[in-house]
Amino acid sequence: LYADGSETVCVYEMPDHPAFLKGISWNLVQGYEQLKHTDDVDWTFVCPSKLLDPDGPRTGDYLTRTDRHIPINEDGNSYVSYDDLAIAMVDFGQNGSFKRQLVAVASRRGGPQA
């Protein structure tokens, strides 16, 4: 995902991105770039918000973005609970939405300031 509106810097390239995740994030970007040129499989590339909360509530209420920008929820946070991300992924698989697309997911509400 892009770090800002310039669409030139990715989140993993920012100084505050955890060092132990930079290599993983770079590899994920490379995988996405390869998928974009694959015609023989259906795929959906799901990106969580900046804060992925393992203990967050299961609301089933989430929002999505497909423009490679960080999703910001109604509380002004880039936040998604594990449960809401899992629900979104199952929904995408069951209803066939976002085929051959990157989609970023955020819980509609919640996060550190909520």
What residue spans do the PLM features occupy?
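Oxidoreductase cofactor-interface core, primarily capturing Rossmann-like NAD(P)-dependent enzymes
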Residues: 1-114
